[in-house]
Regions:
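Alpha-helical transmembrane segments of multi-pass inner-membrane proteins
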Residues: 168-192, 196, 208-215, 219-272, ...
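Transmembrane alpha-helices of multi-pass inner-membrane enzymes
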Residues: 90-91, 283-284, 441-498, 505
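Interfacial loop-to-transmembrane-helix boundary motif in multi-pass membrane proteins
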Residues: 47-54, 59, 106-116, 154-197
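Loop-to-helix entry and N-terminal half of a specific, functionally important transmembrane alpha helix
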Residues: 52-61, 256-264, 423-456
């Protein structure tokens, strides 16, 4: 019988090997094995705490908008940053308990550009003049560019199959109340509390984009339709991953998958968002791509058939189940197509415009840029200006924003980092798909890869946190078979010294 191929050790496996090596060294040097086991147990407890912290960040990314909108709108500008101290705590856990991944070139690059970004901001302040506006925009800009990228690598190193299964189930169960909320928002008046929030002051209310004269685009638990788009797209990725997985290894009944799929599709139907639809189509294309790469005729066929069947059912039932939503969406699509008639390639051409839009600013911005954060929406709201120019109005796409914020040299470097990270992640997904025939890595990459390459990664808070979190989940999915429930691996520690595994109500 031929020997099984030896797979490259993942970061967690390297850590386990390191623990075993330390145990052998301790035995040879007379150190108690129990002491080594206790140390390993402490590290595992820290890993589990890190997982819970990341899940808390994920839940805040979903519900932070609801808190700002329905609970405490007067503190909305502070609640917006509530995730950041938790992320810093996650970094402290990684540093204190050696949870960071190996020093791969891409991980080192993410940390190096974060440090460079800090010095860049100080240099911009020294040469451009320090002010309260520059400080506020600089802190916000640094956060948008650099804070969450290292977290993706830590998630990829420390999340195991049980942790990913928990994230998937949280997301899918949340599709049910979110679908109800989206329907309520769609059928409610534009100025109703469910759409604008509980604030009496006009400036504290959240006015979404209009869908037609009578309806506003649903935002779900977020403050904008962009946030809902991220939630729906990632939920659709999990739905397809579960639907494609063979039944014995799915870990979730087919009826439950069908219910979650229906809830997700209803969110698409009533969102009024073309971006949501197109992103889900892209994820469906990712499922077909998985079918081309996967091994096994049955799995290949299922990966192609499932998204096509879902699409056919959605097209057939959309005007029947949601006639008002269908009419509003088709009118919205027609109106947008008229506006985009000037773009070569229509909506696709507009989406790809971001790849070349930044070139017009290459010679038009200062060498150091106008300043971190000056190309974002916050700069527009504050009417920030430099030498009589409002930089926030110069950039519509994310790559153009890099030119405004960082200048042509560092801005181009950050673009290269984004593209390089996406290519590196895609290579990991390719290898995982060929090795394990698991659909989840490809499904998550269909979302995260798009966001990292061309999404408003530094221009919108929800896209920023979702993009890097799901890049991390994708990395973790590449390490194993996350949708297949499996018994806990045997531990080298005595049973009495093993830390109990925390269980959550949804696990």
């Amino acid at each position: 019988m031929p020997a099984e191929p030896t797979l490259r050790r993942a970061p967690r496996e390297l850590s386990d090997a390191l623990v075993s090596a330390r145990a052998r060294f301790a035995s040879a040097s007379g150190v108690s094995g129990a002491a080594v086991a206790v140390g390993a147990g402490v590290r595992e407890q820290a890993r589990r705490r890190f997982v819970m912290v990341v899940i808390a960040v994920y839940l805040l990314a979903i519900f932070e908008g609801s808190i700002r909108k329905y609970v405490a709108p007067q503190f909305g500008q502070y609640i917006f940053f509530v995730r950041d101290p938790i992320v810093v705590y996650a970094f402290l856990l990684c540093t204190r308990h050696a949870l960071w991944p190996r020093a791969t070139p891409m991980f080192v690059a993410s940390v190096a550009i974060a440090v460079l970004g800090l010095f860049w901001f100080l240099l911009q302040s020294a040469l451009g003049g320090f002010s309260d506006t520059r400080l506020l925009l600089g802190v916000y800009g640094w956060r948008s560019y650099f804070l969450y990228a290292p977290l993706a690598f830590a998630i990829g190193a420390q999340f195991d199959r049980t942790d990913l299964l928990r994230v998937a189930r949280i997301t899918l169960w949340l599709t049910l109340p979110v679908a109800v909320l989206v329907a309520a928002q769609f059928f409610s008046p534009i100025d109703s509390v469910i759409n604008v929030g509980i604030a009496a002051e006009k400036e504290l209310q959240f006015s979404g984009l209009g869908l037609d004269a009578e309806r506003v685009r649903a935002t779900g638990p977020f403050t904008s339709g962009v946030g809902l788009q991220q939630f729906v797209a990632t939920a659709f990725a999990f739905v397809l991953a579960y639907a494609i997985r063979p039944a014995p290894k799915r870990g979730l009944g087919l009826a439950a998958v069908a219910v979650f799929a229906a809830a997700t599709l209803s969110c698409i139907a009533l969102s009024g968002s073309r971006g949501t639809l197109l992103q889900c189509v892209l994820i469906g294309a990712g499922a077909i791509a998985f079918g081309l790469l996967a091994r096994g005729a049955a799995l290949k066929l299922k990966a192609v058939v499932v998204p096509l069947v879902l699409a056919a059912m959605a097209v057939a039932l959309y005007p029947v189940l949601f006639p008002e939503g269908y009419a509003a969406f088709t009118n919205r699509w027609a109106a947008a197509a008229t506006v985009e008639a000037g773009f070569q390639g229509g909506v696709i051409g507009r989406a790809l415009f971001g790849f070349i839009d930044f070139l017009r600013l290459f010679d038009a911005v200062p060498m150091l840029g106008y300043g971190l954060g000056y190309g974002g929406n916050a700069s527009i709201l504050l009417h920030a200006s430099v030498d009589g120019i409002e930089p926030g109005k110069l950039a519509e796409t994310d790559f153009a924003r890099h030119m405004v914020d960082l200048g042509p040299v560092f801005g181009l470097g950050y673009i290269v980092f984004r593209l390089g990270f996406a290519a590196w992640l895609g290579r990991a997904v390719w290898a995982a798909t060929r090795r394990t025939a698991e659909p989840l890595p490809m499904m998550l990459f269909a979302y995260a890869g798009y966001v990292v390459v061309i999404g408003q990664l530094t221009g919108h808070g929800s896209i920023n946190v979702y993009g890097w979190l799901f890049a991390g989940f994708c990395l973790a999915a590449c390490r194993g078979t996350p949708l297949a429930p499996a018994p806990s691996p045997r531990s080298a520690m005595p049973r009495a010294l093993q830390a109990p595994r925390a269980r959550m109500p949804w696990a």
